[in-house]
Amino acid sequence: HIDPWKGFDSKLNFSPDVKMEYLFSDSYIIYAHANGGRENRSLREIAALTPYWYLKGSEYLPTYVSLDAAAGFKASPADGLWLHLAGGYQIRENDLCVNLMSKSAYMFAGLDRAKTKAAYGSAEAKYEYKDIFSLSVGAAYYSWSADGEEENYLLALKPELELNLYAEGKVAGGLRVGAGYDYVKRCSKTYHDVSNLYAKASYALRDGLELFAKGRNLLGSEYCDANAYPVQGLNVLVGAAFRF
């Protein structure tokens, strides 16, 4: 990629765009890729992430991924079973880093920018039995670094370890229920780790109409999400969906 940019920091950015895959035995894939590119976010999109934000500095610069390299292995050794192992390395210029900061008498999600680097490894497994039952489990580990003297501040809300588990099944007729658990260990001990137990149920009626109910944070944990948005107490959503 060759990306020209004009604005507060006019420059030409370069990033690779290479992808390779090898399929063998019809059920196994080895792949590798190296790419990148610009991630533009308008101020409206930032406000959609969290309404409590404060931009440090007078200008907003888009994030540029100068390298996103990864290699992995995908397999389906049995009917309904999928496995995925991957590892990679990223370099992000003007990466949007979020942290809580105090301004006057209020707390804001402070948005800052820095060049960050991350090496990561992940593993995922999923099993499906017809349309009756499905189970997925995944884990990822990240090793972050950032340029500058405020590395701990910039990386505070970045994930160090992510774990997730989800199961869903068909109970009877059009009724389906599911439950899962998400855990995220932050790079900084300043913030509570994400601990989100959630559940959902849906009932399919005729002609594409579906009723659903979702509940998250069933354990009543208190933590901030990746955008410093506070999560407190039980959250419940009930509604209907129509497909046409």
Which residue ranges define each predicted feature?
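Exposed, low-structure sequence patches enriched in small/polar residues
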Residues: 3, 7-15, 19-244
